[in-house]
Structures are given as C-alpha cells and as structure tokens.
C-alpha cells in the first residue's frame, strides 16, 4: 500500500564489497531517491580534503645551502633529490594515533649514507619512520662520497605550499611543499535498489584507494565522522539566537570586516599594493571578486596568495558570496567609517 511519508528512510546497510591491499569498495543503502548523490559528493570531497597523512616539509643537507646546489659525489642535483623525496610516502610512527586536533605534530629524522649505492626509499626505514613505497629511487651515491641529511616530517591534511611551511622551519632547513593527502583515488556510483518491492531507492558504491599511509576503510569512516561533526554544529546552536536580523552590521564578525587592512599583518608589498588603490578596510577586500583582486595593479601571484590566505583565515575566502542585503549593509558601514576617518 502506498503511503505518504513524513520522514526519510534511514540507511541500514554498509557492506565491504571488495578489499585488496590499499583499495576498498563499500556499499551503503538504502537511500531515498535523490539522497544518495546529495551525501556521496561531500563524502568524496572530504576524503580528498580532510584525510590525514604525512609528508616531509623541511630538508637540511650537509654542505648544501639552497635547492639549486649540486650534491658532491651524488649523481642527482638537489632539485632532483627533492623531487624524488616528495614521491616517497612516509608514516611517522610516533604520530600515529595522536589526537588530530593537535597542531604542528612533527618528527625530525637524521640520515647518513656513505659509499657507492643506489639509495632507495626503503633505506629511510627506521625506528621512527615506516616507508610505504620502499622501491622508489632517491639518489645514486658514488664511491668515497657521503650524504648526510635531516628531514622534518609533519602530520597534516591537504596541500601546504612551501611559502607556508617556511614559517615553521628552523635555521638551515629548506622548506618543501607538503602533499599530505593519502588518498590516490575516490569515485562513487549510484544504483537503484529495491525496498519492499519499490525500486525508487538508491545505493552508493564507493571505490577508494590510498597510498598506504592509511587503511582505505578507516579513511572512509574518518571522512564520515568529519562530515557528521561539521553538520552537528547546527544542531548544537539555538537557531533562534542566530536568526538573520536583516542588518549585516549586527553580526559578531562585522568588526573583522570594519578593521583596517593593517590588522591583517600583510607584507609591505601587499599593503602598498592595496594602499595605492585606496583599499583601507578588510570589508573592501571581501566585496571584491577574484578577478577584481587579481586585476589590481602590481598584484603578483605571491601577493594574491598571501591576501587570499589571510581572508580565508578570517572565514571570508576570496569571492565569498554575500546576499544583496549583506553587501548593502557592509557598504553602508564602510561608508560611515570613511566619513569618520577610522573605525567606529
């Protein structure tokens, strides 16, 4: 008998269809029609963005001062050595199982190799480090040569450019880009499934592959947990107390947008670039589109990236879409600040 529902069906089945090495296929069902893709896409994105891995972000080589140096007695130059190093996937044993909410989790490891040898990733295994792709080549050391180097390995997620890791480096270390994500591939398919003879239900099949730093099924569960926490905040806060008032200036973070750009601690180059076109307040940057910001005279890539990172830290990524009411309210607030000649 047909019924008119007042609540969606809750999925009750999760099955591991295949598991081989670092790859797993997982099935979740049943979902109401249209629900499967609604949930599958953000889970896929979170797997790619929030999965935690390990990467070297600092390198110190004895006798080397920058990445364009040569390595005495080593076939590869420093640039190629770094490229090979980035292809090696590490597990920092001391950091496994530590609370991921803790920031700047790292280990430092020292290596010394002497004499003729084909140095491979497996040679970096130690009491502190496990290599998951041991056959990757690293360097060719000639007879009577010695290679001494140290690595700083961090636990993290996503991709972190060397411009950011530079701030974490002790003296003498070269900063490296950090590619932390352990996810090599994640795709999903949506299939129809019968529920009590009704074919209008759906099933999600995830196909997940990692690089070996993390078990793919554990990575999936972790992504779902992140998603649950992200959405859970809406259930924890009283909606009545955060209802939109129609005046953007009433938001708690409106003060951030009325702050002068000096508060962003920009480099002199960035500050001068904005100052020359009359940008005084953070809110003026938030109102600019990505194209407008990139089109500012003398706005190079490094300056743009620096501003974008600062805005992202404030919770307003470049190109943030504000409602017409929010834009109008913010513009009025900035006009008042201009009239007063400073923050109110």
From Swiss-Prot:
Q: Where is this region: Alpha C-terminal domain (alpha-CTD)?
A: 253-344
> Which EC class is this protein assigned?
transferase
Q: Which residues form the signal peptide?
A: none
Supply the domain comment.
The N-terminal domain is essential for RNAP assembly and basal transcription, whereas the C-terminal domain is involved in interaction with transcriptional regulators and with upstream promoter elements.
What's the protein called, per UniProt? DNA-directed RNA polymerase subunit alpha
User: Whose protein is this, by species?
Assistant: Helicobacter pylori (strain HPAG1)
Annotated EC: 2.7.7.6
CDD domains per UniProt: RNAP_alpha_NTD (cd06928)
